[in-house]
Regions:
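A generic structural motif
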Residues: 350-362, 409-419, 513-529, 578-589, ...
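Flexible, glycine/charged-enriched surface loops at secondary-structure junctions
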Residues: 215-218, 320-325, 454-460, 517-521, ...
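A short, glycine/Asx- and small/polar-enriched loop/turn
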Residues: 53-58
């Protein structure tokens, strides 16, 4: 006797029965949602919980009472009183028949297919397939298309589920894949034989239920059952995406997403997916080195190196005072590493430490607060204002949330230095040179202040009073004020703006006047955590910009390279001019070998235990997933040894858990900021726009070979507005000579209508642009 559904049904629920089990499910839900909720297995290929329904594989056919034929569970809404059978003879026969059709053209590649052992088709075929095929005709063969360095194709294996097509269209927003042809002659491809360029494209590997799309750098390296999955997080932006490191014998062979709805859902950016290649590089530091009396760097034991560094730092402190010691820390450092390094410097009498290596203006001492509206809620926003933000490339999975909000009807406006290529539409985009962004934001803030009757603080009062408000500014302010759950995203470029403190004050005033959440993107992967444990200047201390402008006698650089700073030339001068330079990091590049008096090799995020804080303030602790190379050690162990060698009592610990206990309270405590703002000094000439390319963001990414072979990792160039391009006497395909008044370089020049008049777009992160002045500087451009 079948179970009877309850009559006490809520208005938004319906009573159904699945395989004799009564249940209540929401109106409008599909049958497959009900079976999944009841943990009743129904085979499927085209269905994916995050993708639009297609119902084209027909594998999920089920038997519904009174229905004339089996129906697809993924595309059939439940109805009151519906009785569904997933294991009836009709349902099972239908599923077996569909399985037979799907296998007709599928090659017997399992022994050499990278998907073997984790293949959905394999798994379902074991339960629903025939042991011997009845098909004796010639199988279909499809030529493979080269779609770039990240994704390998074996399209003869494709079963036309279209998951990849729907992902690229609906999630990535690029529509780079589609089906061509009819029936079994259908082929999935890029239409014109081009590379997949989306920053999220690698996710089609995960959604593909067969081995048609696989990880190209991982190809033929290992079988699924040889790998150990280690939980970790992404460390190339401040989201902290959850992921698994798949390792074999301590080596990371691939990276895949780990589900976390609050952060990355079940997606992963290509930067996080493929950056593990950078762990193995020709310049990886694998043993301690110290500079001998002959001026040459030579290998040393850890005991010798620690004593050498301790003596060198103590010598500078005794001769010149603690203020002549400084540290520059890459924002990928863990909270434990940052805390111990800050303690080490304080023990030496120094407050000169910073992780904000690309920040020009830090007079308000802002070190990155957590989001006022959580990451997961951004997709529910009614209006979004982007200020100096390109979330699509800077934080790809934040860009995905913004796109979801737009698809739900949110209005998106922007105040940006470049007309970035978004995968959503903007209602109003004010694209102006960096200094003019202050005027634009002041005008929007004035419109909001006037409408809300909010008083401007003294730090921005003059800017609000003198702002020239146009109708477009009023409309932008009104959209924020009228919308529910409006969000202002203060992006990477805004944080690195030459007058970031003033821009931030205007943005906060606008957010206050419109009841909008102010969400600022912290510097790097762990900027919030590092700020909370003290990796910012103490009272009277110097930040990164000051350290580079006024070099100290002793400099400690932690994972930091010249391309990670606001101006490579200044960084090189600071480390070469120091009497004692200690590099503690993973890569002993030529620049490090030229200037460092000591090199102490340490592990990167996948190789160490550490704690990190993301934009929502979520504290995430990870364990080492990969083996440390050579004699490299975890950073906290190196600092403990240094602290002991210097005789500091606070380094009397043996376990990392003891350090975590010391910092646990601080990780939940925001860093107070000041209300000081910079006084803008407008330069002359074309204003430099210095954004950070997606695949040049840090030292690990720059060494990931597959990422560097993608279209997003293009060569350095100067892009000018077409009018400025002609005025400078430049020609298509030619080069430009760019000067900042002190240094000059030659770069390929292009005319780009996305660049505003009066500006020159030259990206950071390239060795070729190292000499130029930083963001917001005035440049002179002529034909080369």
């Amino acid at each position: 006797m079948s179970a009877q559904p309850s009559n006490n049904t809520a208005p938004d629920l319906v009573n159904i029965e699945v395989d004799g089990v009564a249940m209540q499910v929401p109106k409008g839900a599909m049958i497959i949602h009900a079976t999944d909720k009841a943990r009743i297995p129904v085979p499927r290929f085209c269905y994916h919980e995050k993708l639009p329904i297609a119902a084209n594989c027909r594998m999920c056919l089920v038997d519904v009472e009174k229905a004339p034929k089996p129906v697809p569970a993924c595309a059939t809404p439940v109805m009151e009183g519906m009785k569904i059978r997933t294991r009836s003879e009709r349902a099972l026969n239908s599923q077996r028949n569909v399985m037979e059709f799907l296998l007709i053209n599928h090659p017997l590649d399992c022994p050499v297919c990278d998907q073997g052992g984790e293949c959905e088709l394999q798994d379902v075929a074991m339960g629903y397939g025939r042991s011997v095929s009845r098909f004796v005709e010639r199988k279909r063969v499809v030529a493979d298309e080269d779609i770039g360095p990240l994704i390998a194709t074996d399209m003869t294996r494709c079963i036309h589920c279209t998951r990849c097509v729907r992902f690229m269209s609906e999630i990535a927003g690029t529509s780079e894949l589609g089906g061509i042809g009819r029936g079994e002659a259908t082929e999935i491809g890029t239409y014109i034989g081009k590379s997949i360029e989306s920053e999220l494209g690698g996710n089609i590997i995960d959604v593909c239920p067969v081995g048609a799309l696989t990880n190209k750098p991982f190809r033929f390296k290992a079988r699924a059952w040889e790998l150990i999955a280690r939980e970790s997080i992404g460390y190339h932006d401040a989201l902290g995406s959850n992921l698994f490191l798949h390792t074999r014998r301590g080596e990371v062979l691939r990276t895949v997403p780990r589900d976390n709805e609050a952060i990355n859902e079940n997606w992963l950016s290509d930067r996080d997916r493929y950056s593990h290649e950078g762990l193995v590089a020709s310049d990886r530091a694998t043993q301690p080195m110290i500079r001998g009396v002959d001026g040459e760097l030579k290998p040393a034991s850890w005991e010798e190196a620690i004593r050498f560094v301790a003596d060198g730092l103590k010598r500078v402190e005794q001769a010149h005072g603690g203020d002549q010691i400084a540290a520059l820390v890459a924002p990928m450092a863990s909270c434990e590493e940052g805390f111990l390094l800050a303690e080490l410097l304080r023990g030496l009498g120094s407050r000169n430490i910073d992780h904000r290596l690309r920040v020009v203006d830090a007079v308000d001492r802002n070190a990155g607060a957590t989001f006022e509206r959580p990451l997961a809620d951004i997709e529910k926003a009614g209006a979004i204002l982007l200020v100096g933000s390109n979330p699509r490339l800077d934080q790809p999975l934040l860009g995905h949330r913004v796109r979801k909000a737009w698809k739900r009807g949110a209005t998106i406006d922007a105040v940006n230095p470049v007309g970035f290529d978004f995968h959503f539409e903007t209602r109003a985009a004010r694209v102006v040179e960096p200094w003019a962004m202050l005027d634009e934001l002041a005008a929007i803030a004035k419109a909001a202040v006037d409408a809300a009757g909010v008083a401007a603080g003294p730090e921005v009062a003059d800017w609000i009073a003198n702002a020239k408000v146009e109708e477009v500014h009023r409309a932008m302010a009104k959209r924020l004020a009228d919308a529910s759950n409006s969000v202002l995203l203060f992006g990477d470029f805004a944080v690195q703006h030459p007058a970031a403190s003033l821009l931030r004050a205007l943005a906060r005033l606008l957010a206050k006047a419109t009841n909008t959440a102010f969400n600022e993107l912290a510097s790097g992967a762990n900027g919030i955590g590092l700020a909370r444990v003290g990796v910012v200047p103490g009272e009277g201390g110097a930040g990164a910009a000051q350290i580079l402008a006024q070099p100290r006698k002793a400099l400690v650089t932690w994972h930091a390279g010249s391309q990670d700073t606001l101006r490579s030339k200044s960084y090189d001068a600071a480390r070469s001019g120091a009497d004692f330079h200690v590099y503690i990091g993973a890569y002993a590049c030529n620049g490090v070998k030229r200037t460092a008096h000591a090199v102490l090799p340490i592990g990167l995020v996948p190789e160490i235990d550490g704690t990190y804080v993301n934009v929502d303030g979520i504290v995430q602790t990870v364990a080492a997933g990969a083996k440390l190379p050579g004699e490299a050690r975890a950073g906290w162990r190196v600092l403990r040894a240094l602290g002991e060698a210097l005789g500091f009592s606070q380094f009397d610990f043996t376990e990392l858990t003891e350090v975590r206990a010391r910092i646990s309270d601080r990780l939940a405590t925001p860093v107070p900021a000041a209300t000081d703002v910079a006084t803008p000094k407008m330069p002359t000439g074309l204003i430099r726009i210095a954004t950070v390319p997606a695949y040049k963001s840090d030292a690990v990414v720059r060494r990931a070979a597959a990422l560097q072979a993608t279209p997003l990792a293009h060569a350095p160039q100067i892009a000018l507005n077409p009018a400025d391009f002609l005025a400078a006497g430049l020609s298509a395909g030619g080069k430009a000579r760019v000067s900042d008044g002190t240094d000059s370089i030659e770069l390929p020049a292009v005319a780009d209508a996305r660049v505003p008049a009066g500006a020159a777009w030259i990206e950071l992160g390239h060795a070729e642009t190292a000499l130029l002045a930083p963001n917001g500087a005035g440049l002179t451009v002529t034909g080369a």
